[in-house]
Regions:
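Accessory terminal and edge-of-domain segments that mediate assembly/interaction
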Residues: 1-221
Length: 221
């Protein structure tokens, strides 16, 4: 079952019994693809282990381009209120605030309803320990790109394996101020257990679908 890697193509290795799916870009496509897979009558996935993999942005304060991060906290960067930054109070650092709150990073926030997902940290640590000494691909182009981050020592290291929080949002964002917001947002929703290390556009959609599938015993999360 292979046809060029378009969304919802399936790739199966009968020797390793690994089943792969291409979800497509964005939380909506990811949620739809994983829900379709979970409900597909050809597969019994109630005892399957799930690993989410993909390309990501990375915080230069934590790691270099080409590094790989294992995450157990995945935070949604879209579910929020937003006020135009040109109109926010002077003592606010951002116009993003949690739903049901009146100012950014209000400690009295409502219970998460899709804003944060936590995977099994023991599995994350197991995977990290298996791979932490792996030598990653490090072509000369990476060093050239990383050299621009002169104020971030970790960004100039050869690619390496680490652990850290992940933020998923539908907007492809860039910049120091948004980077600072992402760190605070992940720390806020993880209650200080993680900060932003990598960013993507799909993972909270994947987790939401798995959570719903778990309720009908199609998967075990």
């Amino acid at each position: 079952m292979q046809d060029g890697g378009k969304p919802y193509d399936l790739f199966y290795n009968p020797k390793t019994k690994v089943l792969g799916v291409v979800t497509g870009i964005g939380t909506a496509k990811a949620a739809s693809a994983i829900m379709a897979l979970g409900l597909d009558p050809r597969f019994e996935l109630s005892r399957a282990y799930w690993m989410i993999a993909g390309i990501a942005g990375i915080d230069p304060e934590n790691a270099s381009i080409g590094s790989v991060a294992w995450s157990s906290y995945v935070v949604d960067g879209d579910l929020s209120h937003q006020i135009d930054a040109r109109e926010i109070p002077e003592n606010w650092t951002t116009g993003y605030l949690a739903r049901g709150t009146k100012f950014p990073f209000d400690p009295e926030r409502p219970k998460s309803n899709g804003e944060v997902f936590k995977a099994n940290p023991n599995l994350r640590d197991w995977a990290y320990n298996l791979t932490k000494n792996v030598s990653l691909i490090n072509p000369p182009q990476l060093a050239t790109a990383s050299s621009a981050y002169t104020e971030h020592p970790n960004a100039q290291l050869p690619p390496f394996v680490l652990r850290g929080g992940h933020i998923a949002a539908m907007t492809f964002w860039h910049g120091a101020l948004l980077n600072d917001w992402a760190n605070k947002w992940v720390e806020y929703w993880s209650d200080g257990a993680a900060d932003y290390v990598t960013s993507g556009m799909e993972d909270t959609g994947t987790f939401q679908a798995l959570q719903y599938l778990d309720r009908i015993n199609k998967v075990d999360v």
